[in-house]
């Protein structure tokens, strides 16, 4: 048996003393090794790549298994309760990357990260979860500073606090924020003196029993005392539990705590040391102190500089649409032969859809995992840009309402994306694509309302909670996939764009998207922002309520040319419930439906400033007490573009006829350079120019 303990030491200067914060990793060969590139390794990469999104989606703790013997493995990830989702996701993403890079062939490994703004853990192993409690694998560290108070009094208070926390952590169930990952967790603070606090944190993984949690924590406390008694802080990491304490708050674990009542007696601050014989400090002592402090500051500045350079390089690789190097996500790369085997060499019967730049196949990996394989067209120049954009972008996005990228393959002219397989096809299949009423009936109002909420959460993540602000630019029913439980997942990020810090809008000469879903400022001037996605989402909300396509409404008199104009007329005549899909008539909540229609109209207002942000939309949907603004008239702008694929070709807006057609939103007469009937016809035609979805539906 051989074990490699790998520690990342981060030095930082704090007012108390020089602190050593350690992230600990253990690569163990106790249960054997595997062949790099083999089935076990591929399973490991797949399941570890899923942890960042699954841990945040499952309230801070997730465990799962993949594959079959002898290549089956188990994995888990965990963050401390109260951790913000972005911090948790980023922490898990970092530790899983470390596991893949630094444990090349071990069948069991664990990484605890406690050096940032939160604490997280990821591990994998080839033994079932019923394994015995592992107390042998341990990492211990301590603060290099010594306590300057009376140790007898300190030990009494410290032991009282720690004993209380062991009991609390092995039996308590405290809930913080939206996270329910609170089993076997305790974070507490108490007074040592009038001006000094002590902070402590304990946590066990939720898969252990209360007695094992208690045993693990007690052993960790004993190990710390035996190693590091008298120090100003320290930690003990084990595969099933962690223990840390210090004289300052750490990892954001104490942000939500109310100050604990002080113990019955406090330690008194030691009196200042005076010595009549020491009237001056030796010059050598001063020089030594200055040198030490200077070295620490230099080390900190160097670490900061390296971090800034790395983040800049990372951003540049992420932002460039024409970058040739996608090795930043190399651990997601599949061998092209494995993809060919998974799809039976792209057998026609495995084809499940037609994407905007290629075909989509259903495949089964060697470990039994079903996947969706997007094979980009070899003849599409734009497809290569889309491919790079989607790999670099989607690999960094982890959310339960986004389709998860499992990997990619790149060899010669072959450009392939591998996604999680979503079994229930796309939303448009159920809303519009089936003549079978039972299919449409599967989307009752409760499911439709949940779908609206799920899309809201996914877009909110893209706009606000991801590392960069992401504009999807092609939100529509065919790009919303439904999982086995009819939960929505936003797909097709080939057109997505990212914003820099503090950037709120951008413009492009290559307008891409789908007529009827694009806001007027984007079609007319190429301007896009988060409010562009809001407009598209508003149209989609109205489609979900009505069960009809935006382009399916047309009257030759010009009074109605699409769904938005139709809804606006209903709204102004207090008859908005006439919009509701007959398939759900009599089985919906009128207040919820009316509110969704109201929100949809707020989203499609002509002025982007008037459209609500996704965070506001989320509040509107979850808090019925919020009063909604009165919607302003929706915006309509359609150019005379005779070819169905003009938007996909990336031509400049001024290359087209600038004659515009405006649909009537009230009883006023349409006045354009075109005839009234021709204007109405063109309005309808342009609003029906839909781009192809990731999954084209070909069956009922």
Curated annotation (Swiss-Prot):
Glycosylated residues in this chain: 63, 105, 146, 150, 191
Q: Which residues hold ATP?
A: 352-360, 374
Protein's membrane topology = Single-pass membrane protein
The active site consists of 474 (proton acceptor)
Q: Which GO terms describe its cellular component?
A: membrane
Regions of this protein lying in the Extracellular compartment: 25-285
What is this enzyme's EC?
Answer: 2.7.11.-
| Residues with Phosphothreonine modification | 514
| SMART domains with a match to the protein in the record | S_TKc (SM00220)
Q: Where is the Protein kinase domain?
A: 346-626
Q: Cite the ranges annotated as topological domain Cytoplasmic.
A: 307-700
Q: Where are the transmembrane segments?
A: 286-306
What positions are modified (Phosphotyrosine)? Answer: 522
Q: Which residues form the signal peptide?
A: 1-24
Name listed for the protein in its UniProt record: Putative cysteine-rich receptor-like protein kinase 30
Per the UniProt record, the source organism is Arabidopsis thaliana
Supply the gene name.
CRK30
């Amino acid at each position: 048996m051989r074990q490699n303990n790998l520690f990342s030491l981060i030095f930082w200067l704090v007012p108390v003393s020089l602190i050593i914060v350690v992230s600990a990793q253990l690569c163990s060969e106790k249960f054997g090794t595997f062949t790099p590139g083999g089935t076990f390794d591929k399973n490991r990469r797949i399941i570890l790549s899923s942890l960042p999104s699954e841990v945040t989606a499952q309230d801070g703790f997730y465990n799962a298994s993949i594959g079959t013997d002898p290549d089956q493995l188990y994995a888990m990830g965990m963050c401390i309760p109260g951790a913000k989702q972005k911090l948790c996701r980023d922490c898990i993403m970092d530790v899983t990357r470390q596991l893949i890079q630094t444990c090349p062939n071990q069948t069991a490994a664990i990484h605890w990260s406690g050096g940032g703004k939160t604490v997280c853990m990821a591990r994998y192993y080839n033994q079932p979860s019923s394994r015995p409690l592992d107390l042998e694998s341990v990492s211990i560290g301590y603060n290099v500073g010594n306590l300057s108070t009376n140790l007898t009094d300190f030990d009494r208070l410290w032991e009282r606090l720690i004993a209380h926390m062991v009991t609390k952590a092995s039996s308590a169930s405290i809930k913080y924020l939206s996270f329910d990952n609170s089993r076997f967790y305790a974070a507490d603070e108490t007074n040592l003196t009038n001006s000094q606090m002590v902070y402590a944190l304990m946590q066990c993984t939720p898969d252990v029993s209360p007695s094992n949690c208690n045993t693990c924590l007690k052993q960790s406390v004993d190990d710390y005392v035996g190693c590091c008694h008298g120090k100003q802080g320290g930690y003990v990491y084990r595969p099933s539990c962690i223990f840390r304490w210090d004289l300052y708050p750490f990892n954001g674990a104490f942000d939500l705590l109310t100050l604990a009542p002080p113990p019955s007696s406090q330690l008194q601050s030691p009196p200042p040391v005076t010595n009549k014989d020491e009237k001056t400090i030796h010059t050598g002592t001063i020089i030594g102190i200055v040198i030490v402090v200077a070295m620490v500051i230099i080390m900190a500045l160097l670490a900061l500089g390296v971090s800034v350079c790395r983040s800049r390089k990372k951003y540049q690789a992420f932002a460039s649409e024409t970058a040739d190097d996608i090795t930043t996500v190399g651990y997601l790369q599949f061998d092209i032969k494995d993809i060919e085997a998974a799809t039976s060499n792209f057998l026609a019967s495995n084809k499940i859809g037609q994407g905007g730049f290629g075909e989509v196949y259903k495949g089964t990996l060697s470990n039994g995992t079903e996947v969706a394989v997007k094979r980009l067209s070899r003849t599409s120049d734009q497809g290569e840009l889309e491919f790079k954009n989607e790999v670099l972008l989607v690999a960094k996005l982890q959310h339960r309402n986004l389709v998860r990228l499992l990997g990619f393959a790149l060899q010669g002219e072959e450009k392939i994306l591998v996604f999680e397989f979503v079994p229930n096809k796309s939303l448009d299949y159920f809303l519009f694509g089936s003549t079978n009423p039972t299919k449409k009936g599967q989307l009752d109002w409760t499911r439709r309302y949940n779908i609206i909420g799920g899309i809201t959460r996914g877009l909110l993540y893209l706009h606000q909670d991801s590392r960069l602000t992401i504009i999807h630019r092609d939100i529509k029913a065919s790009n919303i996939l439904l999982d086995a439980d009819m939960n929505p997942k936003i797909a097709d990020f080939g057109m997505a764009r990212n914003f820099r810090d503090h950037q709120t809008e951008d413009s492009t000469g290559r307008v891409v998207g789908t007529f009827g879903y694009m806001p007027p400022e984007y079609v007319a001037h190429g301007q896009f922002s988060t409010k562009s996605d809001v407009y598209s989402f508003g149209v989609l909300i109205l489609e979900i309520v009505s069960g009809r396509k935006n382009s399916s409404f047309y009257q030759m008199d010009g009074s109605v040319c699409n769904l938005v104009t139709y809804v606006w007329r209903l709204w102004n005549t207090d008859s908005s419930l006439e919009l509701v899909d007959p398939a759900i008539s009599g089985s919906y909540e009128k207040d919820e439906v009316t509110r969704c229609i109201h929100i949809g109209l707020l989203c499609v207002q002509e002025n982007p400033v008037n459209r609500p942000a996704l965070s506001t939309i989320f509040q509107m949907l979850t808090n019925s007490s919020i009063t909604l603004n009165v919607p302003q008239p929706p915006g309509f702008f359609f150019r005379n573009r005779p070819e169905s694929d003009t938007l996909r070709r990336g031509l400049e807006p001024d290359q087209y006829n600038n004659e515009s057609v405006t649909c009537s939103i009230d009883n006023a007469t349409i006045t354009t350079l075109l005839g009234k009937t021709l204007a109405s016809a063109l309005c309808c035609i342009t609003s029906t120019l839909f781009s192809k979805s990731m999954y084209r539906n070909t069956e009922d």
